[in-house]
A protein has these predicted regions:
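Non-catalytic, topology-defining segments of multipass membrane proteins
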Residues: 1-183, 217, 226-267
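Active-site-proximal inter-transmembrane loops
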Residues: 69, 127-134, 194-217, 221-224
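Glycine-rich, pocket-lining loop/helix-strand segments that form or immediately flank
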Residues: 186
Length: 267
Protein backbone atom coordinates (compact mmCIF):
# COMPACT_ATOMS: atom_id res chain seq x y z
CA UNK A 1 0.00 0.00 0.00
CA UNK A 2 2.80 2.38 0.94
CA UNK A 3 4.70 1.54 -2.23
CA UNK A 4 1.56 2.13 -4.27
CA UNK A 5 1.15 5.60 -2.75
CA UNK A 6 4.79 6.41 -3.47
CA UNK A 7 4.35 5.22 -7.05
CA UNK A 8 1.25 7.34 -7.62
CA UNK A 9 2.97 10.36 -6.08
CA UNK A 10 6.03 9.83 -8.28
CA UNK A 11 3.83 9.50 -11.40
CA UNK A 12 1.93 12.70 -10.56
CA UNK A 13 5.23 14.58 -10.21
CA UNK A 14 6.47 13.25 -13.55
CA UNK A 15 3.22 14.25 -15.29
CA UNK A 16 3.34 17.72 -13.77
CA UNK A 17 6.95 18.10 -14.95
CA UNK A 18 5.88 17.08 -18.48
CA UNK A 19 3.16 19.76 -18.49
CA UNK A 20 5.52 22.41 -17.13
CA UNK A 21 8.21 21.44 -19.65
CA UNK A 22 5.64 21.77 -22.44
CA UNK A 23 4.71 25.27 -21.27
CA UNK A 24 8.36 26.29 -20.86
CA UNK A 25 9.19 25.14 -24.41
CA UNK A 26 6.25 27.13 -25.81
CA UNK A 27 7.06 30.17 -23.64
CA UNK A 28 10.73 30.46 -24.55
CA UNK A 29 10.41 29.05 -28.07
CA UNK A 30 7.66 31.47 -29.03
CA UNK A 31 9.38 34.31 -27.21
CA UNK A 32 12.70 33.65 -28.93
CA UNK A 33 11.21 33.91 -32.41
CA UNK A 34 9.25 36.98 -31.37
CA UNK A 35 12.35 38.85 -30.18
CA UNK A 36 14.84 37.34 -32.64
CA UNK A 37 12.76 37.39 -35.83
CA UNK A 38 9.77 39.70 -35.45
CA UNK A 39 11.44 42.34 -33.31
CA UNK A 40 15.16 42.49 -34.09
CA UNK A 41 14.86 41.44 -37.74
CA UNK A 42 11.47 42.51 -39.10
CA UNK A 43 11.10 45.73 -37.10
CA UNK A 44 14.70 46.88 -36.60
CA UNK A 45 16.72 44.86 -39.14
CA UNK A 46 19.73 44.53 -36.87
CA UNK A 47 21.02 41.60 -38.97
CA UNK A 48 20.59 40.01 -42.38
CA UNK A 49 19.91 36.45 -43.50
CA UNK A 50 19.40 34.62 -46.76
CA UNK A 51 15.92 34.28 -48.25
CA UNK A 52 15.98 30.55 -47.53
CA UNK A 53 16.83 31.06 -43.87
CA UNK A 54 14.17 33.77 -43.67
CA UNK A 55 11.51 31.38 -44.98
CA UNK A 56 12.64 28.68 -42.54
CA UNK A 57 12.41 31.22 -39.72
CA UNK A 58 8.86 32.12 -40.77
CA UNK A 59 7.93 28.44 -40.44
CA UNK A 60 9.71 27.99 -37.10
CA UNK A 61 7.92 31.07 -35.78
CA UNK A 62 4.62 29.42 -36.68
CA UNK A 63 5.67 26.11 -35.10
CA UNK A 64 6.67 27.64 -31.77
CA UNK A 65 4.01 30.35 -31.57
CA UNK A 66 1.26 28.08 -32.86
CA UNK A 67 -2.16 29.55 -32.14
CA UNK A 68 -0.38 32.74 -31.02
CA UNK A 69 1.33 33.25 -34.39
CA UNK A 70 2.25 36.85 -35.16
CA UNK A 71 3.00 38.09 -38.67
CA UNK A 72 6.44 39.60 -39.26
CA UNK A 73 4.81 42.32 -41.35
CA UNK A 74 2.07 43.23 -38.90
CA UNK A 75 4.41 43.10 -35.92
CA UNK A 76 7.28 44.90 -37.63
CA UNK A 77 5.18 47.81 -38.90
CA UNK A 78 3.28 48.25 -35.63
CA UNK A 79 6.47 48.15 -33.59
CA UNK A 80 8.07 50.86 -35.74
CA UNK A 81 4.99 52.98 -35.07
CA UNK A 82 5.40 52.33 -31.34
CA UNK A 83 8.94 53.73 -31.42
CA UNK A 84 7.94 56.72 -33.53
CA UNK A 85 4.96 57.62 -31.34
CA UNK A 86 5.98 56.15 -27.96
CA UNK A 87 3.63 57.23 -25.16
CA UNK A 88 1.63 59.59 -27.36
CA UNK A 89 -1.94 59.28 -28.61
CA UNK A 90 -0.65 57.65 -31.81
CA UNK A 91 1.18 54.89 -29.91
CA UNK A 92 -0.44 51.51 -30.71
CA UNK A 93 0.03 50.49 -27.06
CA UNK A 94 0.73 52.80 -24.14
CA UNK A 95 -0.34 52.66 -20.47
CA UNK A 96 -0.58 56.46 -20.59
CA UNK A 97 -3.44 56.39 -23.08
CA UNK A 98 -5.27 53.20 -22.13
CA UNK A 99 -7.45 52.68 -19.07
CA UNK A 100 -6.22 49.18 -18.30
CA UNK A 101 -4.36 46.17 -19.64
CA UNK A 102 -7.39 44.76 -21.42
CA UNK A 103 -8.29 47.95 -23.28
CA UNK A 104 -4.65 48.39 -24.34
CA UNK A 105 -4.36 44.84 -25.65
CA UNK A 106 -7.73 45.06 -27.44
CA UNK A 107 -6.63 48.23 -29.20
CA UNK A 108 -3.27 46.65 -30.03
CA UNK A 109 -5.03 43.61 -31.51
CA UNK A 110 -7.23 45.78 -33.72
CA UNK A 111 -4.33 47.92 -34.97
CA UNK A 112 -2.19 44.84 -35.63
CA UNK A 113 -5.03 43.21 -37.59
CA UNK A 114 -5.67 46.33 -39.67
CA UNK A 115 -1.97 46.68 -40.49
CA UNK A 116 -1.54 43.01 -41.31
CA UNK A 117 -4.60 42.99 -43.57
CA UNK A 118 -3.50 46.36 -45.03
CA UNK A 119 -6.85 47.90 -44.15
CA UNK A 120 -5.29 51.20 -43.05
CA UNK A 121 -2.82 53.47 -44.79
CA UNK A 122 0.65 53.37 -43.27
CA UNK A 123 3.54 55.74 -44.02
CA UNK A 124 6.24 54.16 -46.24
CA UNK A 125 8.90 54.67 -43.54
CA UNK A 126 7.10 52.09 -41.39
CA UNK A 127 6.80 49.45 -44.13
CA UNK A 128 10.19 49.81 -45.84
CA UNK A 129 11.95 46.44 -46.16
CA UNK A 130 9.70 44.73 -43.61
CA UNK A 131 9.74 41.03 -44.60
CA UNK A 132 6.48 39.60 -45.84
CA UNK A 133 5.44 36.14 -46.97
CA UNK A 134 1.79 36.85 -47.60
CA UNK A 135 0.62 33.41 -48.66
CA UNK A 136 2.18 31.78 -45.61
CA UNK A 137 1.01 34.57 -43.30
CA UNK A 138 -2.56 34.18 -44.53
CA UNK A 139 -2.42 30.48 -43.68
CA UNK A 140 -0.57 30.80 -40.35
CA UNK A 141 -2.85 33.64 -39.21
CA UNK A 142 -6.05 31.89 -40.27
CA UNK A 143 -8.63 30.62 -37.81
CA UNK A 144 -8.13 27.14 -39.27
CA UNK A 145 -4.47 27.19 -38.21
CA UNK A 146 -5.19 28.75 -34.82
CA UNK A 147 -8.01 26.29 -34.13
CA UNK A 148 -5.85 23.32 -35.15
CA UNK A 149 -3.10 24.39 -32.76
CA UNK A 150 -5.64 25.00 -29.99
CA UNK A 151 -7.07 21.50 -30.47
CA UNK A 152 -3.54 20.08 -30.34
CA UNK A 153 -2.85 21.92 -27.08
CA UNK A 154 -6.20 20.77 -25.66
CA UNK A 155 -5.39 17.18 -26.62
CA UNK A 156 -2.05 17.40 -24.83
CA UNK A 157 -3.71 18.63 -21.64
CA UNK A 158 -6.49 16.05 -21.97
CA UNK A 159 -3.92 13.24 -22.13
CA UNK A 160 -1.57 14.45 -19.41
CA UNK A 161 -3.57 16.35 -16.79
CA UNK A 162 -4.39 14.39 -13.64
CA UNK A 163 -5.98 17.20 -11.60
CA UNK A 164 -8.48 19.90 -12.43
CA UNK A 165 -6.14 22.64 -11.18
CA UNK A 166 -3.65 21.76 -13.93
CA UNK A 167 -6.20 23.00 -16.48
CA UNK A 168 -5.60 26.48 -15.07
CA UNK A 169 -2.37 26.41 -17.08
CA UNK A 170 -4.25 25.86 -20.35
CA UNK A 171 -5.25 29.55 -20.83
CA UNK A 172 -1.58 30.49 -20.43
CA UNK A 173 -0.81 28.41 -23.52
CA UNK A 174 -3.65 29.94 -25.53
CA UNK A 175 -2.82 33.52 -24.51
CA UNK A 176 0.97 33.35 -24.43
CA UNK A 177 1.69 36.09 -27.01
CA UNK A 178 -0.70 38.58 -25.36
CA UNK A 179 0.90 37.77 -22.00
CA UNK A 180 4.33 38.55 -23.48
CA UNK A 181 2.90 41.80 -24.84
CA UNK A 182 1.41 42.81 -21.49
CA UNK A 183 4.68 42.19 -19.64
CA UNK A 184 6.68 44.49 -21.92
CA UNK A 185 4.18 47.02 -23.25
CA UNK A 186 2.31 47.59 -19.99
CA UNK A 187 4.55 46.65 -17.07
CA UNK A 188 7.70 47.61 -19.00
CA UNK A 189 6.39 51.18 -19.09
CA UNK A 190 5.40 51.31 -15.41
CA UNK A 191 7.82 49.28 -13.26
CA UNK A 192 11.59 48.92 -13.22
CA UNK A 193 14.66 51.13 -13.44
CA UNK A 194 16.13 53.35 -16.15
CA UNK A 195 19.63 53.77 -17.52
CA UNK A 196 18.75 56.58 -19.91
CA UNK A 197 16.61 59.68 -19.82
CA UNK A 198 13.79 59.37 -22.30
CA UNK A 199 10.70 61.21 -23.49
CA UNK A 200 8.74 57.99 -23.00
CA UNK A 201 8.14 55.85 -19.91
CA UNK A 202 10.17 52.78 -20.94
CA UNK A 203 11.78 50.88 -18.06
CA UNK A 204 14.16 47.98 -17.59
CA UNK A 205 12.06 45.35 -15.83
CA UNK A 206 14.78 43.01 -14.60
CA UNK A 207 18.40 43.25 -13.52
CA UNK A 208 18.90 39.88 -15.22
CA UNK A 209 16.17 39.21 -17.75
CA UNK A 210 15.62 35.50 -17.22
CA UNK A 211 11.92 35.75 -18.11
CA UNK A 212 11.82 37.68 -21.40
CA UNK A 213 15.18 36.84 -23.03
CA UNK A 214 16.36 40.47 -23.19
CA UNK A 215 13.03 42.09 -24.05
CA UNK A 216 12.81 43.29 -20.46
CA UNK A 217 15.65 45.78 -21.01
CA UNK A 218 13.08 48.10 -22.52
CA UNK A 219 14.66 51.42 -21.54
CA UNK A 220 17.98 50.36 -23.07
CA UNK A 221 16.19 49.33 -26.26
CA UNK A 222 14.30 52.60 -26.61
CA UNK A 223 17.63 54.44 -26.33
CA UNK A 224 19.47 52.13 -28.77
CA UNK A 225 16.72 50.77 -31.01
CA UNK A 226 19.18 49.89 -33.81
CA UNK A 227 21.36 47.75 -31.54
CA UNK A 228 20.88 43.97 -31.57
CA UNK A 229 22.02 43.88 -27.93
CA UNK A 230 19.32 45.07 -25.54
CA UNK A 231 21.54 44.54 -22.49
CA UNK A 232 25.17 45.32 -21.76
CA UNK A 233 24.81 48.74 -20.15
CA UNK A 234 25.31 47.35 -16.64
CA UNK A 235 27.32 44.23 -15.85
CA UNK A 236 24.26 42.20 -14.88
CA UNK A 237 22.25 43.05 -18.02
CA UNK A 238 22.82 39.88 -20.02
CA UNK A 239 20.73 39.63 -23.17
CA UNK A 240 20.35 35.88 -23.76
CA UNK A 241 18.87 36.36 -27.23
CA UNK A 242 21.84 38.46 -28.30
CA UNK A 243 24.22 35.73 -27.12
CA UNK A 244 22.35 33.25 -29.33
CA UNK A 245 22.49 35.73 -32.21
CA UNK A 246 26.27 36.01 -31.81
CA UNK A 247 26.50 32.22 -32.12
CA UNK A 248 24.27 32.22 -35.22
CA UNK A 249 26.46 34.98 -36.68
CA UNK A 250 29.61 32.98 -35.91
CA UNK A 251 28.35 29.91 -37.79
CA UNK A 252 27.11 32.03 -40.71
CA UNK A 253 23.34 31.58 -40.36
CA UNK A 254 22.80 35.31 -39.84
CA UNK A 255 25.03 38.35 -40.30
CA UNK A 256 24.91 40.97 -37.57
CA UNK A 257 25.14 44.54 -38.78
CA UNK A 258 27.71 46.87 -37.18
CA UNK A 259 25.95 48.37 -34.18
CA UNK A 260 26.63 51.63 -32.35
CA UNK A 261 28.57 51.43 -29.11
CA UNK A 262 26.34 51.37 -26.07
CA UNK A 263 26.53 54.67 -24.27
CA UNK A 264 27.21 54.90 -20.56
CA UNK A 265 24.06 55.15 -18.54
CA UNK A 266 22.76 58.63 -17.83
CA UNK A 267 20.88 57.81 -14.63
Amino acid sequence: MVYCCYYLYFCSIIILMIILLFIIVLWYGGLFFQTFFLHRYAAHQTYTMSKTVERITFILTWVFQGSNYLSAYGYGVMHRMHHAYADTEKDPHSPKYDLNIFSMMWKTKNIYYQINKQQIEVAPKFTKNVPQWKRFDDFASSWVSRLAWSIAYFSFFFVYTTSLWQWLLFPVVLLMAPIHGVIINWYGHIFGYVNFKSKDTSKNLFKFDFLMMGEGYHNNHHKHSSSPNFGGVRWHEIDVTYKIMQLLHFVGIIHLKPSPLLLKREV
